[in-house]
């Protein structure tokens, strides 16, 4: 495990893993709750996620000879992750900087009614 991955693991354990009594989305109870958003929204966590994510994207680009222009996913979970990777890409390789996008479950009910936001 790389130093970056080890640091992210430690931060996840510190910030995102909780014990106690929790009601899950399914309605079931659990004595363990993991909320990775807490780590992803932490500036140090975002930095580590960005480094690891950008390394994974670069590996995919190189091994499969791909051209990747953007990164994103469903809001809210993907937002801090894709932004961290996009920002890291811009700092590390400005000529290959990834645009970031987010996808809503439903189109907006006002304005331009967009379901996907980003710089395309």
Please describe what each predicted stretch is.
Residues 27, 71, 100:
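Conserved hydrophobic/aromatic pocket- or pore-lining residues that grip, position, or stack substrates
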Residues 32, 79-82:
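Short active-site-adjacent helix-start/loop capping segments
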Residues 40-43, 79, 110:
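Loop/helix-junction capping segments adjacent to catalytic residues or to phosphate/diphosphate-binding pockets
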Residues 45, 72-73, 109-112:
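Glycine-centered small-residue hotspots that permit tight backbone geometry or close packing
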Residues 64-77:
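Short glycine-rich phosphate-binding loop at a beta-alpha junction
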